[in-house]
């Protein structure tokens, strides 16, 4: 079976991959064997923002094609397609720190009702993502479940990681909500003090 058997769009996306990204995928497929391991070892290739974009685009094409009637009626092709898609997803899970990619992976887990995967993604969020990227997830996502996960993670970060976002107009409300959660659900006096100071500064500016 070749990549062309997956359909024209997937073949086109595959042909557009850089050689290093294709090699990374092939190596990851060989590592995972016949199983869809959630913990593919980090590939011995350079990973950059463009690889992020390439893998995300390929995963979107694979997931979209796998939901078509033609794919659903061909078990062998569907199985191979899902194997490649799971490999893309696992690489993105272990390597990416992008808000857009996190949303894509979390939405994929929700579609599959894969709540163990969603829990792993939540763990990755606290390990790999900056406060700004977590706030960007909250800003972009339309999913209440994903927003709740991101807010919970943001509220668990140190106050000095979240507080600077109060000065960014894109994230002011998000940061304030996360600090309120930290102050009242986690009894953080530091968060309460930051919020009190923020409210006082806002009052002076508006007064």
Label the model's feature ranges.
Residues 2-33:
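N-terminal "cap/leader" segments of large eukaryotic alpha-helical scaffolds
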């Amino acid at each position: 079976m070749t990549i062309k058997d997956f359909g024209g769009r997937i073949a086109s996306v595959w042909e557009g991959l850089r050689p290093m990204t294709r090699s990374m995928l092939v190596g990851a497929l060989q590592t995972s064997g016949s199983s869809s391991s959630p913990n593919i070892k980090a590939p011995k290739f350079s990973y950059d923002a463009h690889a992020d974009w390439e893998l995300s685009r390929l995963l979107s094409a694979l997931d979209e094609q796998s939901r078509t009637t033609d794919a659903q009626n061909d078990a062998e092709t569907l199985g191979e397609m899902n194997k490649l898609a799971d490999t893309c997803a696992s690489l993105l899970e272990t390597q990416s720190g992008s808000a857009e990619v996190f949303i894509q992976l979390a939405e994929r887990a929700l579609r599959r009702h894969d709540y163990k995967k969603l829990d792993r993604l939540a763990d990755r969020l606290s390990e790999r993502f900056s406060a700004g990227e977590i706030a960007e997830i909250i800003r972009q996502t339309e999913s209440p479940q994903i927003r709740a996960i991101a807010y919970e993670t943001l509220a668990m970060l140190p106050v000095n990681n979240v507080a600077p976002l109060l000065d960014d107009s894109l994230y002011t409300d998000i940061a304030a909500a996360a600090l309120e959660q930290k102050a009242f659900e986690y009894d953080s006096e530091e968060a309460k003090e930051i919020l009190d100071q923020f409210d006082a500064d806002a009052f002076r500016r508006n007064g």
